[in-house]
């Protein structure tokens, strides 16, 4: 009876050793950085891996293969990636990426790396000069079959019960249509870092793509239509503009029931205009810069460009969910328009697609949207955007310290009148029937620039949609107001306080 129990104990001991090694074995990796001079690091050597207790550690390698010549890019430690679990060898499987990437578990396992395409293409291997086997190597290979098999079974059961893969394998072959080509799609690794926002259609992560930070908007499978719509807007010719969010890639990640739909875009650390105004009071010049670049972005989005920089025809596009949460800020407070999931294109001879009337964020809905009386024509949708722009401009003015008076805590439009979570009926009563708008404070009107800007705001949110300004007109006005105020001396400012008509604003005829 003792022999079977001894064998079982021996098996269990090797199992425990193998299990322990699976998560703790990777302590050091081969290090290499081709850009060591620019990044001011060592070129090569060994890297000691450090991470959180519940995270697994791996080694990775990335390289280029130009006509059979292997060019190393980077090697080093990599943190807790599901694709690296239980891989003793560093093997890349992508067909033809611009940069090959592989990861593995085990000390120095990235010393040797291999490209082995899943389709069965030729194997390309980089192998360092051979070294004589050591006793430790012989022992490791002797225990590897038993320990490895046991570890795989345990890990498979544990992962099934406790977690799903944090970063799935790229799977774009079932895509409903080809994403626009992007030079960064093939670059690896991409690692999710932290959730920055949650919205109607999913969450937005800050992620790292090689040496750059990017934003990853993750849609659940049930919101596939929104992901597809936003991807199609981004793929429209002429969508590259300094005041529109930069698109990088669209991908499917995972498989079967674990599929997630990713949109990868530029990352802006200051976040949305809403978040920035909550925590910051802005100056007059900052207000003008945000307002001018924001209106420039919306003006370009609305514009129909017959031949845009050789890319083809850029149609007029209505945003349909314009709000301060969907305006991002660059490091210099330049505004960038984002979230085109509800946007609609107006192409000659083609229907504009889904033009359901009551879409967007309820608080920012124009009167005609709230009462369901929309004219389903291009100009009607652009004017709806302009009503929302008036509300966002009001948010900017409400947090500006230029006027001689108190700056209140940040509040959303109509929050003072009907609270943070208004119903559709409450908004209809206030906006449509009572024709109320957010309050314009008396002390704002004593500042020459803010007073003129308030006139522009009122012409953006006019109850009569046809009387509203265009985005291009708002851009012109803000630029003119800024120059007129900044170009005056303090003596002139005193005289301007009593009259805000000293500067001729662009006429309403420049509206849509």
UniProtKB/Swiss-Prot annotation:
Where do the record's region annotations for Interaction with DYNLT1 lie?
A: 491-512
Its membrane topology: Single-pass type I membrane protein
UniProt keyword terms in alphabetical order:
ATP-binding, Cell membrane, Disulfide bond, Glycoprotein, Kinase, Magnesium, Manganese, Membrane, Metal-binding, Nucleotide-binding, Phosphoprotein, Receptor, Serine/threonine-protein kinase, Signal, Transferase, Transmembrane, Transmembrane helix
Recorded catalytic activity of this chain's protein: L-threonyl-[receptor-protein] + ATP = O-phospho-L-threonyl-[receptor-protein] + ADP + H(+); L-seryl-[receptor-protein] + ATP = O-phospho-L-seryl-[receptor-protein] + ADP + H(+)
Cofactor(s) this protein cannot do without? Mg(2+); Mn(2+)
Q: Which residues form the signal peptide?
A: 1-18
UniProt-recorded name of the protein: Activin receptor type-2B
Supply the source organism for this entry: Sus scrofa (Pig)
> Which gene is transcribed and translated to give this protein?
ACVR2B
């Amino acid at each position: 009876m003792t022999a079977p129990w001894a064998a079982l104990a021996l098996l269990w001991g090797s199992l425990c050793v193998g299990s322990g090694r699976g998560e703790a074995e990777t302590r050091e990796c081969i290090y290499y950085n081709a850009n060591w001079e620019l990044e001011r690091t060592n070129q090569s050597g060994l890297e000691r891996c450090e991470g959180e207790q519940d995270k697994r550690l791996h080694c990775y390698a990335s390289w280029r293969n130009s006509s059979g010549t292997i060019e190393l890019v980077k090697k080093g430690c990599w943190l807790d990636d599901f694709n690296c679990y239980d891989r003793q060898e560093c093997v890349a499987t992508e067909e033809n990426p611009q940069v090959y990437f592989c990861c593995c578990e085990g000390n120095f396992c990235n010393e040797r790396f291999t490209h082995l395409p899943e389709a069965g293409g030729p194997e390309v291997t980089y192998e360092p000069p051979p070294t004589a086997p050591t006793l430790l190597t012989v022992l490791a290979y002797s225990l590897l079959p038993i320990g490895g098999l046991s570890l795989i079974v345990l890990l498979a059961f544990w992962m099934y019960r406790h977690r799903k893969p944090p970063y799935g394998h790229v799977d774009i072959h079932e895509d409903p249509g080809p994403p626009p080509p992007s030079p960064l799609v093939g670059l690896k690794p991409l690692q999710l870092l932290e959730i920055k926002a949650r919205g109607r259609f999913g969450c937005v992560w800050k992620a790292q793509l090689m040496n750059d930070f990017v934003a990853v908007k993750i849609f659940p499978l049930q919101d596939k239509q929104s992901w597809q719509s936003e991807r199609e807007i981004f793929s429209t010719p002429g969508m590259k503009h300094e005041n529109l969010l930069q698109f990088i890639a669209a991908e499917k990640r995972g498989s079967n029931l674990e599929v997630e739909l990713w949109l990868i875009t530029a990352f802006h650390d200051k976040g949305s205009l809403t978040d920035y105004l909550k925590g910051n009071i802005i100056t007059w010049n900052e207000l003008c810069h945000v307002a001018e670049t924001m209106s420039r972005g919306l003006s370009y989005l609305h514009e129909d460009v017959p031949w845009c920089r050789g890319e083809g025809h850029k149609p007029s596009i209505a945003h349909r969910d314009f709000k301060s949460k969907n305006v991002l800020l660059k490091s210099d407070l330049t505004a960038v328009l984002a979230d085109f999931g509800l946007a609609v294109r107006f192409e000659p001879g083609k229907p504009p697609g889904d033009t359901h009337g009551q879409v967007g964020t309820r608080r920012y809905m124009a009167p005609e949207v709230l009462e369901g009386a929309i004219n389903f024509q291009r100009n009607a949708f652009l004017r709806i955007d302009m009503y929302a722009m008036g509300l966002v401009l009001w948010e900017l003015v409400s947090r500006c310290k230029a006027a001689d008076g108190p700056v209140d805590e940040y509040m959303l439009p109509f929050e003072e009148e009907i609270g943070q979570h208004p119903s559709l009926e409450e908004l209809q009563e206030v906006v449509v029937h009572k024709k109320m708008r957010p309050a314009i404070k008396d002390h704002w009107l004593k500042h020459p620039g803010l007073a003129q800007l308030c006139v522009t705001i009122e012409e953006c949110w006019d109850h009569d949609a046809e009387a509203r300004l265009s985005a291009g007109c708002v851009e012109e006005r803000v630029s003119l107001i800024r120059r007129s105020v900044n170009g005056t001396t303090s003596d002139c400012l005193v005289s301007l306080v009593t009259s805000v008509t000293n500067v001729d604003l662009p006429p309403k005829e420049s509206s849509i």
